[in-house]
């Protein structure tokens, strides 16, 4: 039970940390390794019940040359993104039941229980704009800061996306960035930018948006770390777009409650003398037979033999390919949905992933407008990465 009809940072963190502690030791950081933990908690305002529904740990991304055209490899394995993708697994499972989703026969879609909300937590400030503390002097805002103990400015390693400067490490507040890293540059946007996107268009993504009546937003964003700054978090997630108009009936920019509690400790938080763990961890609130807990290495499932590395057996349950199959399976075996999508999905084995995403017309229209108004410099991945179908990996 959560007090005051809203879960506190401490209550949310307790659910996340207890679940992490209960998971098998395999895949977790070893001695002198650190990682980031992120989780999503469901809260019912009517019953005041809280439950953890998704957990992710990770710090890695793959470079542009390693992007997979068949949807088998995760591009982005930062904790925030893993937790969100694990959340998608949970939502698909819930659509098979009659607990938080209910069929709306008038709209031919699913409504989510109005008493249910979701709260996000991370043990570290999201990479990108949220890590930058704006300086008082405007002329100095874009000054290059060194990564040393004397720097008074919170530093992000996320790389600036701009045609106006040759220096991708300029600490410019409010700018779009790709993920940090010393290797090949990635096309994955920073976690600050992704959370800002979810704050406008929802966390459900295009495929799930086809099935539900309203986008799903986080009611609160919670951070338990020493370096989190409320001003920077608010700017990164919604304030940097305050001056830009966006008119859409279904999707609206949110102003979620942002909470910080530096007193909560995660045993594997980042330390300067430790190395980042190479593994990603994902847990979802789904039945045991569906394998709720997985370990990722380089965007693939740990333990897969070299012979099967390029097959669907290497794909995590939260990969594009596996979530696509989950979507198609849900539609196929749900009489209401199969009737509704009878024409569009007449040949489900050969329909392209991109074609299914395009079924979410409202979502795609809004996303195009959002990119024009908010995220003009959002990276573009090759379209052929979305052309796979269920038969691509068989």
Swiss-Prot record:
GO cellular component, one term: cytoplasm
GO molecular function: double-stranded RNA adenosine deaminase activity; double-stranded RNA binding; metal ion binding; RNA binding; tRNA-specific adenosine deaminase activity; tRNA-specific adenosine-37 deaminase activity
Reaction(s) catalysed (UniProt annotation): adenosine(37) in tRNA(Ala) + H2O + H(+) = inosine(37) in tRNA(Ala) + NH4(+)
Keyword hit for Hydrolase: yes
A GO BP annotation: tRNA processing
Catalytic center residues: 80
EC number: 3.5.4.34
Binding site for 1D-myo-inositol hexakisphosphate: 84-85, 194, 197, 320, 357, 381
Cofactor binding note of this UniProt entry: Binds 1 myo-inositol hexakisphosphate (IP6) per subunit.
PROSITE patterns listed in its UniProt record: A_DEAMIN_EDITASE
Binding site for Zn(2+): 78, 127, 191
Keyword Oxidoreductase found: no
Keywords assigned: Hydrolase, Metal-binding, tRNA processing, Zinc
Tissue spec. comment: Widely expressed in early embryos, and later concentrates in the central nervous system.
Pfam families the record matches: A_deamin (PF02137)
Cofactor(s) essential for the protein: 1D-myo-inositol hexakisphosphate
Annotated ranges, domain A to I editase: 54-388
InterPro entries: A_deamin
Record-stated family: Belongs to the ADAT1 family.
Protein task: Specifically deaminates adenosine-37 to inosine in tRNA-Ala.
Name of the protein this chain belongs to: tRNA-specific adenosine deaminase 1
Organism annotation: Drosophila melanogaster
């Amino acid at each position: 039970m959560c007090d005051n009809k809203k879960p506190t940072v401490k209550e949310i963190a307790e659910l996340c940390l207890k679940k992490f502690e209960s998971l098998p030791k395999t895949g977790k950081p070893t001695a002198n390794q650190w990682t980031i933990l992120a989780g999503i908690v469901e809260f019912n305002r009517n019953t005041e019940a809280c439950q953890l529904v998704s957990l992710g740990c990770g710090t890695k991304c793959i470079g542009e040359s390693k992007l997979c055209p068949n949807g088998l490899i995760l591009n982005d394995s930062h904790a925030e993104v893993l937790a969100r993708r694990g959340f998608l697994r949970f939502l698909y499972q819930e659509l098979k039941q009659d607990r938080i989703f209910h069929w709306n026969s008038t709209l031919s879609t699913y409504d989510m229980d109005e008493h249910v909300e979701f709260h996000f937590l991370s043990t570290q400030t999201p990479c990108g704009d949220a890590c930058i503390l704006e300086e008082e002097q405007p002329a100095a805002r874009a000054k290059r800061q060194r990564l040393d103990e004397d720097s008074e400015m919170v530093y992000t390693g996320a790389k600036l996306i701009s045609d106006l400067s040759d220096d991708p490490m300029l600490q410019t507040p409010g700018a779009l960035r790709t993920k940090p890293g010393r290797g090949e540059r990635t096309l994955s946007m920073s976690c600050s930018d992704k959370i800002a996107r979810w704050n406008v268009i929802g966390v459900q993504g295009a495929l799930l948006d086809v099935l539900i009546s309203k986008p799903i937003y986080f009611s609160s964003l919670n951070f338990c770390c020493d370096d989190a700054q409320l001003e920077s978090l608010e700017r990164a997630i919604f304030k940097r777009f305050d001056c830009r108009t966006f008119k859409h009936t279904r999707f609206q920019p949110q102003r979620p409650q942002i909470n910080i509690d530096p007193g909560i400790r995660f045993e594997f938080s980042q330390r300067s003398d430790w190395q980042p763990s190479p593994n990603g961890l994902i847990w979802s609130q789904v039945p045991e037979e569906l394998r709720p807990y997985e370990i990722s290495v380089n965007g693939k499932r740990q333990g897969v033999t070299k012979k099967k590395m390029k097959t669907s057996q290497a794909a995590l349950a939260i990969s594009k390919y596996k979530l696509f199959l989950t979507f198609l399976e849900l539609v196929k075996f749900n009489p209401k949905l199969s009737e509704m999508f009878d024409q569009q999905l007449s040949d489900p084995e050969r329909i392209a992933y991109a074609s299914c995403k395009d079924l979410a017309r409202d979502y795609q229209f809004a996303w195009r407008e959002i990119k024009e108004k908010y995220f003009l410099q959002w990276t573009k991945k090759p379209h052929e990465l979305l052309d796979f179908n269920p038969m691509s990996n068989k």
